[in-house]
Amino acid sequence: MYLYSELQEREKNGNPISVCLIGAGKFGSMFLSQSVTTPGLQVTRIADLDPSRAKLTCKAVGWSDVQIDSVHFTDDALRAIQQDDFDVIVEATGHPSAGVKHAREAIKNGKHIIMVNVEADVLAGPLLAKEAASAGVVYSMAYGDQPALTCELVDWARSCGFHVTAAGKGTKYLPQYHLSTPETVWNHYGISVEDAAQAGMNSKMFNSFLDGTKSALEMAAIANACNLAPPSNGLQFPPCGMNDLAHVLRPASAGGQLEINGQVEVVSSIERDGRPVTNDLRWGVYVVLEAQNDYASKCFKEYGMNTDSSGRYSAMFKPFHLIGLELNISIFSATLRGVPTGSTKDFCGDVVAIAKRDLKVGEILDGEGGVTVWGKLLPADVSIAKRYLPIGLAQGIALNKSITAGNAIGWDDVKFNVTDDAIAFRKSMECLFSAKDK
């Protein structure tokens, strides 16, 4: 993107790009560590439920007292969004309902939004993106997180004239992880409870990485941004290393494991018996591409590309992602170019709540990474037609029916407040896209 010279010029002229950060957790702290070493960039406001903790975070990532004193800290995110001393908002709370509210307020106030909050994006991103476009502001995925990095690879492949067969990321997966809870998660990671606590690791958040929910959310986000298909019955998580991507993730008709030619999928870094996969992609992202003619296929071989046995399918991948350390790219792309680093375009994929165990009438759902539900990726048209409850709203609401373990929870199975802003917005989005498909 060749941004650095523009940033230097802004630094020289005293005209930095200014940011309001909402949520100073892990992602936010990684961004903050880079913000003070980047010319032409300034954080003017930080909104967090605990402003004093946010100040300590700034100190911990290397900010000086002078730099901390130059920022306005608050626990009132909506009021912060309404101010006029910044160019772009970074929404990094991870709370779906709050994320929707913050994004809508940002759009109302003409601010670009970098949506770190994939939970909110999958819950309501298709409609948020439409509202942002109508208001003339950028609604963007967060560069550094796996969805944006995957979208970049997809865009590269398509812009080069290749067909995208599959795209996604890697993770650590075994089928039994779907039932993991915050009480069992550290055993699966091989980390002691004491070490996790000392490192400040949130058991519910880390459990959402393990139980498949986060993978489902990220693949839904990619599907919605790149018009790729979700599998018909959830992610399959095939064990696969970097060198085998083109072999495993080609269509079933060509000898691979893909249900759909042009879908999202997550590959596991471990075999089903627990053995490690060779050259795993646990922390990375990939795209599998197909040559559209014999000449391009021949070039794959000539230039050392790793292909399947036919020579027509190959893969490009990035074996890492640096989370908030790379977020600046989204900020600069939105403000200097007016272009998102990936953005929702349609409603292809949805993530629905699945019971982890038998649930009784009156039980309160505890959402992503909890003890009651995990999130499963499904085609959005299936989710809407069957009136399934999105995982982003499966928190703090009571069941009015008993649910058997492994079954999806529906809107009719819970007591919800139709006047709740996030629920009302989601319902309006479902109506919009249902009508569009008719």
What are these regions (language model features)?
Residues 72, 79-99, 112-116:
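Rossmann-like NAD(P)-binding element
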Residues 49, 94, 118-121, 144-145, ...:
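Short, ordered loop/turn segments at secondary-structure junctions
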Residues 140-210:
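Rossmann-like NAD(P)H-binding beta-loop-alpha module
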Residues 50-83:
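Conserved N-terminal Rossmann-fold NAD(P) cofactor-binding segment
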Residues 93, 97-105, 109, 117-138, ...:
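Rossmann-fold NAD(P)-binding glycine/threonine-rich loop
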Residues 1-10, 188, 192-438:
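C-terminal catalytic/substrate-binding lobe primarily of soluble NAD(P)-dependent oxidoreductases
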Residues 1-61:
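N-terminal Rossmann-like dinucleotide-binding module
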